[in-house]
Design a protein with these regions (language model features):
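Helix-loop boundary and gating motifs at the non-cytosolic
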Residues: 2-63, 241-285
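Transmembrane alpha-helix termini and helix-breaking/packing motifs in multi-pass membrane transporters
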Residues: 38-46, 158-179, 271-272, 382-400
Length: 428
């Protein structure tokens, strides 16, 4: 069914690209049913936990998303997309079953954050790296990435909406059953996924050439000098390439303020907006509606606008949308803010992924994306140390408004004062 809908809405994509979009849509919908409601919602509403507990949950999740993304990138580079996808499916099913089996106590919710974070990170290359195994054409990559982003954002509508209804009818923990169901559907959609043979052969040839070069410098085989690029080489690739290095810094600095949102949003709903746990799903769905519109906008961007400057404008719009979202105590205004926020994110994600995929070497792409993801997630981890103190000192809403100001100010400052570096990177 999802393949049929994708075929109708994206007729220009190849069959394998449509299958990839369906794979990402289904597994990501499963994640979206569960994270916000199943972990943060359980802690806030069912357990009555403190801001410290929700901050710990977000910290654990972000740390293990980072670890999972490194593991997933390594698995992709070593074994290719098909085996990586199967491991993602098995890990997600095992996580859902474990969380359901062990109850909803605070300790279990925190352990669930660890497991869920790891499998979400492990599965990230499906969206960030798989497209490069289908084509190396920049325009086609932009179209695939925009379609993935658009349907990922449909996931942000469908997943939290269904999760909200399940939480209202049963419990916040029951959403993990939905996650497992969508994961099984993703397995069905991805069963016939086949990367382009030329692309896979090219990756293997690059690995073989590197292996030959290293073998000529050694008397015997050494696993530490494997043919495959190490993480150290991927880190070097990021920071010796002007575009990738600047992109890493942009995403890190722009997301630094956003890290305060995750542990405090549920308290904003409960104590400022005065709504129930189901609204955590429904307001997230509003963001998904906006993100679909943003992805459609990204799909229509001309090639000359697929660059770092456009990305900064989109990131600044994320900050402005977040200010509208948390700036008042009215749920209607928060709804509009979530739509605006979603539109901005819908443009950011395909731009970011396309820039990375057209810049990084394919044989290192999985781990280069892991390095980029590390910067993104670490930026979200750092504010968690002070989020509870800020909320206790200034209040939840004021802290969120301050975070929104940071998210807005960083890309604005980079646009105003970093134009020379941006121009140099764009020319290269």
């Amino acid at each position: 069914m999802s393949l049929f809908l994708i075929s109708k809405s994206q007729p220009s994509l190849s069959v394998q690209a449509k299958r990839l979009v369906a794979m990402r849509f289904l597994i990501y919908t499963g994640f979206q049913t569960s994270y916000f409601i199943g972990v943060i919602g359980t802690l806030t509403y069912a357990d009555g936990a403190s801001v410290v507990a929700t901050s710990l949950a977000v910290l654990f999740m972000n740390v293990f998303v980072i670890l999972g993304s490194f593991a997933g990138g390594a698995a992709l580079d070593a074994w290719g997309p098909r085996r990586h996808f199967l491991l993602s499916i098995v890990g997600t099913l095992a996580t859902g079953a474990s969380i359901i089996a062990f109850g909803s106590a605070t300790g279990t919710a925190l352990a669930g954050a660890v497991l869920l974070g790891f499998v979400m990170g492990f599965a990230q290359p499906i969206a960030t790296s798989y497209p490069a195994y289908l084509t190396d054409d920049p325009v086609e990559l932009k179209d695939i990435n925009s379609a993935i982003t658009m349907f990922s954002n449909v996931s942000i509508i469908v997943g939290p909406t269904l999760g909200g209804f399940v939480a209202a009818a049963a419990s916040s923990r029951a959403v993990f059953v939905l996650m497992m169901l969508f994961t099984l559907l993703a397995l069905i959609a991805g069963w016939g996924f086949k990367p382009q043979e030329v692309r896979v052969a090219g990756r293997e040839n690059a690995d073989s050439a590197e292996e030959g070069e290293r073998a000529s410098q050694a008397n015997r085989p050494n696993p530490s000098t494997s043919a495959r690029a190490t993480f150290a080489a991927s880190i070097k690739t990021v920071f010796t390439n002007s575009v990738l290095a600047l992109l890493f810094c942009i995403i890190f600095l722009s997301n630094f303020g956003y890290g305060a949102f995750d542990p405090l949003e549920s308290f904003f709903y409960r104590d400022v907006l005065h709504v129930g746990v189901e609204w955590m799903g429904w307001l997230s769905s509003a963001s998904g509606v906006g993100a679909v519109l943003g992805a459609v906008l990204a799909l229509r961007l001309p090639p000359h606008l697929v660059n770092l400057k456009t990305l900064l404008v989109a990131l600044m719009s994320v900050g402005l949308g977040s200010l509208l979202y948390v700036g008042t105590p009215y749920v209607g205004v928060a709804l509009v803010g979530q739509v605006a926020l979603g539109i901005a994110w819908g443009v950011v994600n395909p731009l970011h992924n396309t820039i990375v995929q057209t810049t990084a070497p394919l044989e290192q792409l999985g781990r280069v994306n892991s390095v980029m993801g590390f910067g993104n997630m670490f930026a979200g981890v750092a504010p968690l140390a002070i989020a509870p103190w800020l909320a206790a000192t200034f209040g939840v809403q004021r802290t969120l408004v301050g975070a929104g100001l940071v998210v807005t100010a960083v890309p604005a400052a980079l646009l105003l004062f970093g134009r020379r570096h941006l121009d140099r990177a764009v020319k290269q």
